[in-house]
UniProtKB/Swiss-Prot annotation:
This is Probable endonuclease 4. Zn(2+) 2 binds at E145, D179, H216, E261. It comes from Aeromonas hydrophila subsp. hydrophila (strain ATCC 7966 / DSM 30187 / BCRC 13018 / CCUG 14551 / JCM 1027 / KCTC 2358 / NCIMB 9240 / NCTC 8049). It comes from the Bacteria. One of its GO terms (biological process) is base-excision repair. InterPro entries: AP_endonuc_2, AP_endonuc_F2_Zn_BS, Xyl_isomerase-like_sf, Xyl_isomerase-like_TIM-brl. Zn(2+) 1 binds at H69, H109, E145. It catalyses: Endonucleolytic cleavage to 5'-phosphooligonucleotide end-products.
Length: 281
């Protein structure tokens, strides 16, 4: 079964995300468990935790249908020791919040070398940061998102992702979230059926589908290989529709959250219905 949804607002409390997902016909969703642009956040209240779990149970949302995202400030490959420590502490707090909510994934961008250390050294720090957080948490898988490769961001190539995973000691608690827009921007062509088949074959060979824990389903305002991160609605922009047909008809993408981060939330319901219509009977 395909679990399709969107990154919905947690305004007013994380317990409100379930109703927002249901309102667009989703059977998956993503959320921030705290303000994504601040380092510090108030702890989750017991009332909010209970209400979230109850709403998930009533709505039929299991943990594997939910893909929380961490703060954009966190850089697990930070070249500065103080910046790295601050990022690790914040990441662990995010892991603990997922634990409290009974969730099993935490999606994150791997980090940036900031032109201060070699790429390989920063990738090693990301792996070490994941190990550090996994040792101090339970039950939550660290889900690395492929990036567009903008600026000094790591994680734009499948080789980067494989290198990070290789350095993680507990392979059962690390995974990948594949973003269609980011892959396209990073130079992975997804504009035809044959191109999609080739890219996903390369992903299988380099990373492995056993690590795929979620996807971000996005169109692209950016051009191919531009290394610029600009999302678009599914049926607009430069990516085209072939990749969405492929995903909806490939059972390797069953049973994981497929999350819209497209730019017009007023049509998320329409985009979810359109995706479902692509599945061949």
């Amino acid at each position: 079964m395909k679990f399709i949804g969107a990154h919905v607002s947690a305004a007013g409390g994380v317990e409100n995300t379930i109703a927002r997902a249901q309102a667009i016909g989703a059977n998956a969703f993503a959320l921030f468990t705290k303000n994504q642009r601040q380092w510090q956040a108030a702890p989750l209240s017991e009332a909010s935790i209970h209400a979230f779990k109850l709403a998930c149970e009533k709505g039929g949302f299991r943990p594997e249908q939910i893909l929380p995202h961490d703060s954009y400030l966190i850089n697990l490959g930070h070249p500065d020791p103080d910046g790295l420590a601050k990022s690790r502490d914040a990441f662990l707090d995010e892991m603990k919040r997922c634990e409290q909510l009974g969730l099993c994934y935490l999606n994150f961008h791997p980090g940036s070398h900031l032109k201060q250390i070699p790429e390989a050294a920063s990738l090693k720090l990301v792996s070490e940061s994941i190990n550090w957080a996994l040792e101090r948490s339970q039950g939550v898988t660290a889900v690395i998102e492929n990036t567009a490769g903008q600026g000094t961001n790591l994680g734009w190539s499948f080789e980067h992702l494989a290198t990070i995973i290789d350095g993680v000691e507990d392979k059962s608690r690390v995974g990948i979230c594949f973003d269609t827009c980011h892959a396209f921007a990073a130079g992975y062509d997804l504009r035809t059926a044959d191109a999609c088949a080739a890219v996903f074959a390369e992903f299988e060979q380099t990373v492995g589908f056993q690590y795929l824990k979620g996807m971000h389903i996005n169109g692209a305002k950016c051009t191919f290989g531009s290394r610029v991160d600009r999302h678009h609605s599914l049926r607009e922009g430069n990516l085209g529709e072939a990749v969405f047909h492929h995903i909806m008809n490939d059972d390797r993408f069953d049973g994981i959250p497929l999350i819209l981060e497209t730019i017009d939330e007023s049509i998320w319901g329409d985009e979810i219905r359109w995706l479902r219509s692509l599945a061949k009977a």
